[in-house]
Amino acid sequence: MAAVLIVVLYCIPAYAETMTPEKQKQLNEYYQQAWKLLGQMHKDTSNLDKAYAFYQKALAIAPNYDKTYWKIAEISFKKAQEAKDDAASKKLYHEALENAKKSVALNPNSVEALYWIGTCEAKLAELAGIFKAMGLVKSAKKNLKKSIALDPDNRFSVLARVILAILYTEPPWPLRDLGEADKLTAKAVEMDPNLTLSSVKRARVLMKNGDNELAKKELQRCLNIKKPTYVWDSELYDWPEAKKLLSQLK
């Protein structure tokens, strides 16, 4: 059930052309191995540590390549989601945030790094309490919007729309903006119908707006997706959430 590998993820950075062909090949292999392991985290979460080890090897070859840092941020973020308590999660989200910032320091226009910065900030704000972390919420929105603006069709821009929608859906009034959340989730579902995260969050927005029948249809569609974009997220988080929401609507 592994998700289809996206070849562009393995491209070698432009400056790496000065490296030997052997080193270029090795860097590419590290990325492929790490991606495969991430794609199997739903079967064994220890694969995250194994993927992290490959990215550390990639850093040893190309220590100033921005892409590796946001990929390490992704691993820390996933580990935070699986952590046993809030303290452990918070530490890992901070680690992810710092690595994403390192990526942006090397490449200020990294769509992926800006997405991870915004997403980590959103999670840290959630752990702290929205009203106690207004600065984080504001920064998260700014970084997510910039990620989208830089490359609206990038797969991370699709994800950024969903995280932005969550920031507009979950907080209490007056921070809530269900109209904006509706637009963002509708666009995300349109851009990637197989992204279960956008589907389940779209259903949440519909429920908040009182459109329970449409929410049911979206949840059923989510659960019937045969080839989810990220099968690990679908199995660990999105499908269980969809089932829970659907049970509330029956």
Regions found by a protein language model. Name each.
Residues 2-10:
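Bacterial N-terminal signal peptides
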Residues 10-67, 216, 244, 250:
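Extreme N-terminal leader/anchor segments
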Residues 19-21, 29-53, 72-109, 115-146, ...:
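Short coil/linker segments at helix-helix boundaries
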Residues 185-187, 199-204:
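Short, local alpha-helical segments
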Residues 193-199:
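Alpha-solenoid helical repeat architecture
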Residues 202-250:
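Long, ordered, amphipathic alpha-helical scaffolds
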